[in-house]
């Protein structure tokens, strides 16, 4: 029996209007929107979640799913890591956060050993190919998030769009 699953796409921290400042009110509101959406998706029968584990919105999503899992132990979280050592060049604090979150995931799928051009899109396609619904934090600009949404549309995957606040 197929277990309905949900994945996520969103911008990296450096592309967010508030950057790495997670105390910014816009960031706090987005994190709440992500949690509320994850909770609603869970209530609709989606208990498996896939996360790409990139800096920024992906980690917000991961944290929201793990928070949901505290109250709902049937939640399953898979980390879809594009390449081994994804966080090796991140700032120490973000790398520690990443590693702590990775340890709490039920499954970690590493798609390839080393970085290569296109490995992020390969990861994004893997997630869409294994999901029935996509939550997207998107600001309207070109990039990996838009490409992932376009791929999801081609695959006939439902998209729940969470717009980003500019200012």
Task: Put a short name on every predicted segment.
Residues 1-166:
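Acidic/glycine-enriched connector segments
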